[in-house]
Amino acid sequence: LGNPARPGGMSPLVGSAYRGICNALLCCGRKKYSLAYEYGLLRGGLFVLGYCHFIHRYAISHQIDRVLFFSRDGEILKRVYDLLYPGNGSKYVAWSRLAALKMTAHRNPSLFFERMFLHKSGTGITVKQALLSADLYPLFRSHPLPFSSPLDRKNVHLLQKAIRSRWPEVLQIYAQQSQAAKQYYHAVLEGCKKVCAVDIGWVGSGAISLMQLAEQDW
């Protein structure tokens, strides 16, 4: 009954077994599940199960003191991880690629500007919205920038020039945020010698940035 909507691309043995499990759960009539639940089970269930098992094996084999699950994307992983391995001592922590980008701006200004502004040009957001997302609008509100105009390939270079003209002040703003993050993570990592961070992003920039901050800046 449910096979046309079941995931493919797996080996015949694993695919058949997983489709059978999904069909038995979703089509037995005992309970009606939401579409969001069905989608998560079908498209992410097997991945999450395998990923959590990999994380746990890695933590044991490398004698990890604490596993960190980053906010938002890591929430469901943390919940499944706790179901599979209760009392594991892992932590769900506040962290994001945006926060990492701002707190490591001093390391690579070009990368900061590229990801914070250049990649957003042509998406429909205004110059003001771009500055607000970077926590920089109060610093530049008196500058002659086209705040109400959509961010595009032309005005993004004007924005870059303005930011470069006040770069030390930009870094000072982010240094204050970094100090707050330092206090937060000091409590999270207290007593730990080896920590593993779980980052869903394909680049892994969140985990790499946190490692750099913890080992070199904090």
Language-model features: locations:
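An acidic- and aromatic-residue-enriched active-site/binding cleft used to recognize and process polar
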Residues: L1, R72-D73, W95-L98, I200-V203
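Short glycine-rich phosphate-binding loop at a beta-alpha junction
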Residues: I64-S71, V195-V198
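Extended charged low-complexity segments that act as oligomerization/scaffolding linkers
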Residues: G2-G44, R79, L83-L139
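Glycine-rich phosphate-binding "P-loop"
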Residues: K31-F47, K161-Q176
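Short, surface-exposed basic-aromatic patches at helix termini and helix-loop junctions that form
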Residues: I60-S61, R79-K91, E190, S209-W218
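A short, well-structured juxtamembrane/interface segment
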Residues: F47-S61, Q177-V188
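PRPP/pyrophosphate-binding module of the type I phosphoribosyltransferase fold
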Residues: L1, H143-W218
